[in-house]
Amino acid sequence: MGEHQNVKLNRTVKAAVLTVSDTRNFDTDKGGQCVLQLLQVDNVEVSDAHYTIVKDEKVAITTQVKKWLEEDVDVIITTGGTGIAQRDVTIEAVKPLLTKEIEGFGELFRYLSYVEDVGTRALLSRAVAGTVNDKLIFSIPGSTGAVKLALEKLIKPELNHLIHELTK
């Protein structure tokens, strides 16, 4: 595995960011804006058409993700709707679309959340990642702390390697 740790892609990585929230708009979407800022640092491209907000509704989430799966993106990151509240349905919308689940992502995210961020409240997270054909999907909580942890500790360090493995 060590031979792939510093994989460099010969192209720009294209991402889509979906915020799932009944209350956020583009001015108040701190989680989605945090994703955009952290991706921009690594020259990951997110066009205006690939950043949006939908309500906590399974059909709305599924429809948007399916639309982006048909477009020229490498990775889709959803924020919000991953907890256990009645309205938290992101996982129910995304998981059935996955070809393969990357179980280690959710396990490591919850572990790091426990150790570095929220303690035992980490057990409330149902964060998930997986693949759909040659695309990656990550569904993470919407708090900026969770977004930073997921992107800085897990997603960004492995993104090129994951894309390389999916497309080789």
Curated annotation (Swiss-Prot):
The keyword Zinc does not apply. Pathway: Cofactor biosynthesis; molybdopterin biosynthesis. Pfam families: MoCF_biosynth. Disulfide bonds: none annotated. Belongs to the MoaB/Mog family. May be involved in the biosynthesis of molybdopterin. This is Molybdenum cofactor biosynthesis protein B. It comes from Staphylococcus aureus (strain MRSA252).
